[in-house]
């Protein structure tokens, strides 16, 4: 389950069962309704234990929000999560396997949860807590495709290892980017190969939103995870080779080699433009109409992409039409 849906239960699921007469209680709060929330988690573990699972640990507030209010201290949050983890581990022992080392578990150190993990000079965080032994620590990017933290050499022996939660699509502030695949492959390569070198190798998750138009970036993310030796390479230029092979894989037999080269160019340049500025943050003042030829270069590049795509639109075979549009 996702980063904010612990013990195999979707957050929205609680809203379907909550109420004054529900055995789960009527508050998504481990402070005021610990018995109801515990029972809710127990039933989720029982329901899913026959399947292959990676159980999400921890807890966030309703609808993927902060678990406690703004008036609560860092210590309040950390103490609550310690208790949550203790209860969840005991539930897993009772319902799944008494040997926790045999149960795949993860906790996603996302947004404010990252602060709860590290703590500060006055308040020890969850780092090193025995309740996290055997739990994969899922680090995250900054919602915009840049990793926030990577494990230090001292941290890399954590039992349970490390994972990465990476955004190719993001709904939220300060600005969202959705619907259009805009992940720049060289940056994706840079961030994920660095994560791999720092020992983040147990779980990779990407928030992809809708798969349509994301196939290119998602394919590279998965292929890189599957075969780091092949696609890790020595520098980001290997993403150019990947693009060539990916275009060939999608359209081989539908277009000539010369035509495939033009389609590769269009996809690469389009991806590069989006790396500079995504659709959601584009406006008339981004590219200067005079200095450094910024606006002119973007216009010429855009016109070339449109020319290539329009040129082959009408000759694309029907069985490849869906792939061509995406």
Describe the residue ranges of each PLM region.
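Catalytic domains of carbohydrate-active enzymes, especially glycoside hydrolases
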Residues: 1, 43, 47-52, 194-203
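Short acidic, gly/pro-rich beta-turn/loop elements at beta-sheet edges
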Residues: 10-19, 67, 117, 148, ...
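Generic low-polarity alpha-helical segments
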Residues: 1-4, 138, 246, 325
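Short, solvent-exposed turn/loop segments enriched in Gly/Ser/Thr/Pro and often Arg
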Residues: 4-9, 208-212
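Glycine- and acidic
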Residues: 22-27, 64-74, 169-178
């Amino acid at each position: 389950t996702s980063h904010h849906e612990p013990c195999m239960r979707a957050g929205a699921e609680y809203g379907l069962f909550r109420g004054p007469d529900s055995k789960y209680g009527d508050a998504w709060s481990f402070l005021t309704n610990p018995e109801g929330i515990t029972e809710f988690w127990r039933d989720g573990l029982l329901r899913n234990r026959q399947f292959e699972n990676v159980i999400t640990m921890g807890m966030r507030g309703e609808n993927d929000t902060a678990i406690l209010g703004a008036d609560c201290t860092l210590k309040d949050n950390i103490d609550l999560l310690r208790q949550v983890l203790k209860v969840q581990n005991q539930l897993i022992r009772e319902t799944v396997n008494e040997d926790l080392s045999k149960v795949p578990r993860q906790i996603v150190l996302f947004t404010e949860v990252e602060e709860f993990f590290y703590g500060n000079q006055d308040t020890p965080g969850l780092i090193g807590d025995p309740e996290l032994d055997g739990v994969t620590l899922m680090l995250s990017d900054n919602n915009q495709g840049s990793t926030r933290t990577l494990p230090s050499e001292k941290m890399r022996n954590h039992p349970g290892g490390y994972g990465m939660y990476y955004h190719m699509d993001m709904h939220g502030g300060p600005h969202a980017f959705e619907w259009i695949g805009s992940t720049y492959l060289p940056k994706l390569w840079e961030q994920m190969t660095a994560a791999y070198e720092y020992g983040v190798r147990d779980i990779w998750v990407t928030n992809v939103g809708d798969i349509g138009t994301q196939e290119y970036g998602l394919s590279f993310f998965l292929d890189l995870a599957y075969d780091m030796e092949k696609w890790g390479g020595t520098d980001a230029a290997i993403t150019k080779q990947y693009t060539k092979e990916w275009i060939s894989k999608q359209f081989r037999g539908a277009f000539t080699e010369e035509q495939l080269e033009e389609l590769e160019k269009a996809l690469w340049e389009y991806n590069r433009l989006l790396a500079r500025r995504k659709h959601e943050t584009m406006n008339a003042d981004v590219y200067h109409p005079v200095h450094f030829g910024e606006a002119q270069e973007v216009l010429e590049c855009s016109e070339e992409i449109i020319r290539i795509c329009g040129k082959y639109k009408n000759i694309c075979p029907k069985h490849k039409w869906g792939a061509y549009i995406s």
